[in-house]
Amino acid sequence: RLGMATGNNDVYLRLWQEVSIRKVGLGFDSRDAALASGKKWFPYNKGGKFRRWYGNNEFVVNWENDGQLLRNTLHPSGERIWAHNFNLDYIFKPCLTFTATSSSYFGIRYSEKGFLFDNKGSSYFSNAEKLKPILGLLASKPATAILKAINPTVEFQPGNISIIPFFEEL
């Protein structure tokens, strides 16, 4: 899934160390639970440098009141909502996340429940028990070779990932 575009990262995103940990919501598995927590900042997968297996958990996003500000702030033109592509049915679920732009290697990582995700940190969703075996497959050299054959550029899109063949049991 392609992730959210905030429209203005300077307003909506912070590094972890820039906010009070008391205002950060960790480990929530649903929008309702996050809303009920009263927290303002939530973990945000935004891509980042090449890293395989786990990591690049550097940012938090302002998702206070179920993202009310993000979901309702108009673009300066006044013609549309500034942020878009919220994927509300998928946020806070465990997933595999990958950086859209890469030097040459495909870096895919496991992400626990509780994260929202960015358009530069797109995510792959499946049954939670299957995520780690799928991670093993997608982080392999054969998967990288297939991805390079499908898309020889440095941009990895969700559609590229979805056509990698694997056993139905996964």
Predicted feature residues:
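Polybasic, glycine- and aromatic-enriched phosphate-binding surface used to engage nucleic acids
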Residues: R1-E169
